Regions:
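Positively charged, polar, low-complexity stretches
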Residues: 2-130
Length: 130
């Protein structure tokens, strides 16, 4: 198990998508800049797939699995940020699903189109499986 120091701290509004550490002001800063911001407080990576659909208003046909998550995230129409407050709990609780979920989200942040940012909140004393 290792800490995750390689995830940069978000300062201001990013020019492109990515995965960032968030401070208390990051969600409001992005919302003020016109980003759609969804906040999720779940320590279960499987639940996150459902919660993302809820907070971002995915269509009723959303399949609530990783493939459906990837598809719906690629259909975004404007800059979008997901603030995940309990990510450390998810990483420890189910490392395999956490890893797969992070891979899907990382790929989604790299796709062309409006930026997508995943903001990992909470104190950075969290432990992430390596």
């Amino acid at each position: 198990m290792t800490a995750a120091p390689d995830v940069p701290l978000l300062r201001g509004v990013p020019a492109r998508g990515g995965i960032y550490r968030a401070d208390r002001t990051s969600p409001q800063t992005l919302a003020d800049a016109g980003w759609r911001v969804g906040e999720i407080d779940s320590g279960d990576p499987r639940d996150l797939v459902i919660r993302v659909g809820e907070v971002l208003g995915f269509p009723s046909y959303y399949g609530r699995n990783l493939d459906a998550l990837a598809d719906c995230l690629s259909d975004r129409t404007g800059p979008t940020a997901l603030v995940w407050h309990a990510w450390g709990d998810a990483a420890v609780r189910d490392p395999r699903t956490w890893s797969r979920l992070l891979e899907v989200l990382q790929e989604a942040t790299e796709r062309p189109g409006p930026p997508l940012a995943l903001l990992l909140a909470r104190p950075w004393a969290e432990v992430v499986p390596g």
